[in-house]
Amino acid sequence: MIVCPNCNHPNPDGAVQCEACYTPLPATSNCPNCGATVQSDAAFCGQCGFNLHSVAAPAATVATIAPDVPVEVPPLANPDPLLELLQPNALGLDPVANENPPAPAPLPPTAVAAPPDATPVVVEVTPAPPPPEPVVVEASIPTPPPEPVAPPEPVPAVEPAPAPETVVAAPPSPARTQLQQITARLVHVQSDQEIELPPSLSVVHIGKPNDRIPPDVDVSGFANSEIVSRVHADIRLEGDAHYIEDVGSSNGTYINNLPLLPGNRHRLRPGDRISLGKGDLVTFLFKLA
């Protein structure tokens, strides 16, 4: 395994660059002692602790020394054989030349690196230094170990009381269907005309057309409607109950011939008589159907 020097990512043996950051990885070699894979610039083997520098110097010497190989230079031009025969010493008959032949050129010395074991090692013997003077050290008083502290007894956890199961009673479907079918109506006593209250509204405004609050129940078409204010009364739907309140009319609102003061409200029941204004001239009966 080769560890990247840039990001410390472990790479497989033989990898050239890091798989994570693509940084070139250092070259590796084998430990001469145990054969483990080590980096070429490592000082010690990570497996057996062998000193790799002890064998790195001879190996470098063998690698750098190379024998000098003579280079033969071919002649620039081939001599003419006829001219060689005309020379006086062409046949080599010169006695002086035969008596003193030219010495052959010496071969370059071949450098042979000596094996590591054959290299003599000169060990310098140095005299042992004198033993150091004994230093008197005062004996320190041993500190008594702390007394063991008994761990506190675990307090048994109090199991919480099981919460009572909440049973949510589903509302009966027939009652829901009955509420959906019940609608509130106002029956005009003077004309016997029925007005259905909008079931989608939680507040039904009763009055006549105006610029402030448009009425949901417009009484301007009934007789004697001049005694009804433009913003006269409201009927509120809260759950399954209907409430009526006077919102500041000029001639007042009466429930069952009793005045309904502004700010108060009355829960309507089937058959209640609602009079808008004095004199019982614009009257409605509350009905549920």
Curated annotation (Swiss-Prot):
ZnF bounds (DZANK-type): 4-49
Domain FHA, residue spans: 204-260
Gene3D superfamilies the record matches: 2.60.200.20
Keywords, comma-separated and alphabetical: Heterocyst, Metal-binding, Zinc, Zinc-finger
Pfam families: DZR, FHA
Alphabetized GO MF terms: zinc ion binding
Top-level division of the source organism's lineage: Bacteria
Zn-finger region bounds: unnamed: 18-48
GO BP annotations, alphabetical order: heterocyst development
Entry-linked CDD domains: FHA
Protein's job: Putative heterocyst to vegetative cell connection.
Protein name: Protein FraH
